[in-house]
Structures are given as structure tokens and as C-alpha cells.
């Protein structure tokens, strides 16, 4: 069948691609190793829809440009597939960007670069009608006074800070809506618990092979999309596609906690630039928090992450690890955000981050400060997607669908 596509991986990227292809009339088999869609790294993160602020150390400015472009398209594209407003995604309060005393860019340097991003934002919104999560902020960033910062943060840790328009969504809410959309679409067949082992060329098409419940399975199609995130490079290699240098997988833990009523309108915050952390305050009186030095507990330059990372990335964490990790992350976070001491942890889990680099984020020259060489690469009817960030997934889904349409017209 010409209008049939196999989409491998049912995280946010694979689901968005499947939904867009299905809307265009393609029949899609959405193949996933887990029992349900959207149950691994896509859900186990802070949900930030990046405006480019955290990647401001990219001296070529390519990453901030890409993130801003993707952020302005995130909600409009998502609404094509799940048909809801942003308010249904439990959006957190706007972020303060707090400049640590240990930041390798000082407040003045950051202000100059944020001004450059602000200019780019103004140019973008003049040319296009896209909004940021349903809003059209007058400004992305404003420098904050020390008096204002001191209302919520320990300014002894800081050299300055900025109030921003950046927001985070609740990934668990997004997962609920994505799963419903996938389940009800008549053009999508979800194949869960299907481990994918390899891909091979088959005439003008492809064969995807794998395992389910100790039995082998095989699927054929003229077009295949690799949106597997952690297995992307391994599967690319089975087709003879060379693996890029300096692949890096990191395992980063997070805590979701209950907060008291009086905190529900407190600001969200990101500390920059280096090995620091984030807090997201949500309207349902929960908070996301992470502190990188204690949260990043896995580092691998192998082509795929270690098998031992599988359970925490599915939300399975032993009680002793739950207690130890939550205690550490809360203790370290309350040093700069004192009210966090009043929270009660309810979830501890981890997401796998796929990037490129040898050195960590506290190195000014680390490749981790760049995330622009990502997106879709096509080899005939095989489309391999390096998502990069949650923010960019809907935009790359549209690109992938456009490529699939083009290939279909050539068949």
C-alpha cells in the first residue's frame, strides 16, 4: 500500500508525526516498545517550551533562533492533532531566569544576548501570525530588581535575574491528550510492546523487524520514520547510516511535588548558566523540580543508553532511591528557592536526554550549549528524526509529513 507509513517510536515526536500523516490520509502503524504511547522521556521532563533563553551561550545564535521558531509553532501545530487549548495543559507560571554567582556569563553579558533574541522575536512576530502558547508577549525578557528577586529567591546565591515570558506545560496532561488522539484516529494502528531490532532495504521499500513476547515480527512499507529517540542511531546503523561523533546520553531525574495553596502563583525559575536547576510551579498546586548536579545520574557515549536506565525512564524507581533523590533535590533547591522546603514529593522518575558532546554544561565550550543540528534527515523513503527538544517536535512532525507526501507523489 503506497499510502502506508511505519512510524517507529511513540514519544511526542512519533505521535505527532503519526497524527499529521493520518490527518493527510496515510495509514500509519505506530510501533512502540512500551505498552502505551508517550510514556518515557517525552513525559519525564520539565515541559518547558523553549524560547531560546537557555541556549543563549550558542555564539552562532543558531539554537536560540531554532527554539524561538519552534516555540511559536508549538501550540498551533499541536492543536491540529489534539484539538484543545493551551489552558488544558496545566501551564506553569512564567519563568524567572536567575543568574548564579557561578554563571560563566554575567548579568550584563546575558542582557546583551537576550536583547538580541528580543529583536529576533519582534521581527518574527511582525512577519508571522503565530503566538507563543496562545499568548503574544510584548517582551520576552526584562531585567529584575534585586528587591523583586528577594521576594521569592535567596539573592545571596545570585548576581542578578530576569523576568521572562517563557512557560512550561504539564507533560502528563499533554500525554493524556496525545494518547486519546492516537487511540481514536481511524488511520492509526498502535502496536505496543513491540521492540524494534533492525531495518533493512527491500526493493523500493523497507522491512522493519523486531520482537514481541519472545516472538519475532516483521513489517514492510515503502516509507519508514525513525522517531525512536534513544534507539535512533542504533537503527540508523542497521541501514548503513554512519553514526555521528560524540553521541551523548544522559539520565536526568526529576521530582514532582505537592505544594501548599499559597505557593500556586509563585514564579517558576531556571538558574543559569552551568550545572544548576529548575522549578516549575503549576496551577494544580504541584511543582516540578530538578538540580542538575544531583539529578544527572547517568552519562554514556555509547550508541544506545544502558539497559539499567530502562526502569527509571518508565517511572519505576525503588523507594530507597525515591527517598534519597527527592531529599537531595529538595534540599539543594531550597537553598536558592526557600519556599520549596514546604513541598511534598509525590513522583520521582527520570528522562533520557540525547545530545552531542564530551564535556558537561558547566564548560562554556561544551557542545551541549548548541542544539541546532537536529531535525529530519531523509534517505529516500526512510526519514530519521533527531528531535532534540520537546519544543521542536511538532515543527519536525510537519516537516516529516511534508517529506512523506513528496516521496508518495514520486512513487
Language model segments and positions:
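Dinucleotide-binding Rossmann-like beta1-alpha1 core, especially the glycine-rich loop
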Residues: 47-146
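N-terminal Rossmann-like FAD-binding beta1-loop-alpha1 element of flavoenzymes
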Residues: 3-30
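Central helical "cap/lid" subdomain
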Residues: 38, 213-272, 282-285, 304
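Helical element adjacent to the flavin cofactor pocket in flavoenzyme catalytic cores
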Residues: 160-223, 227-236, 393-401
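Glycine-rich FAD pyrophosphate-binding loop
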Residues: 23-43
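Flavin (FAD/FMN) cofactor-binding and adjacent substrate-gating region
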Residues: 101-180, 185, 201, 365-368
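Flavin-binding catalytic cores
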Residues: 117-121, 285, 296-354
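C-terminal catalytic lobe of FAD-dependent flavoproteins
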Residues: 159-165, 331-411
